[in-house]
Amino acid sequence: MNNAQFKIECFRNGLYSPEQIIEFYKVVHTEETKYNSRDAQLWINGKSSREYQIDLKAIQIVDMLNAIRSEVIAKEKERIELGNPRYKYLFKGEQALWSEHQEFINLPVNFYNSIMVELGKKDLIYFEFSKKDIES
């Protein structure tokens, strides 16, 4: 995967900035990493005169997100065809997303939102916590 492909795949999966890429990298690979947002910037932009080597674990993260994305989209399309969609909301933050859909725990809210865009969902509303949810 070259730098341009990596950038498009990151954007496709809701990782829009070098900081978001490194933050998610650290979620997946909990051991200490030597990489920072400057490295991620080079992974997505390359160097002016040549391609920049992308860390293999970063590529594996993109591949993992693509696999999850494909599975979620396929299942939701089946539910839509049956008239029983599961995903009906947009979320303003990860905690709300994770409380409603445990299958997205530790995934960025932008990942979920990008799936909604790809599914062509236009009738979504924002998810709001009820008072009961906040108290429990």
Give the positions of each predicted feature.
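Recognition helix of helix-turn-helix/homeodomain-like DNA-binding domains
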Residues: 26-54
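Alpha-helix boundary/N-cap detector
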Residues: 1, 53-60, 107-110
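DNA major-groove recognition helix of helix-turn-helix/homeodomain DNA-binding modules
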Residues: 50-71
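Residue-level detector of alpha-helical secondary structure
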Residues: 44, 62-66, 77
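Residues within the helices of the helix-turn-helix
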Residues: 19-22, 38
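A short, Lys/Arg-rich alpha-helix, primarily the initiator
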Residues: 1-20
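Helix-turn-helix/homeodomain-like alpha-helical modules used for DNA recognition
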Residues: 70-136
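Secondary-structure-rich domain cores
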Residues: 10-11, 22-25, 50
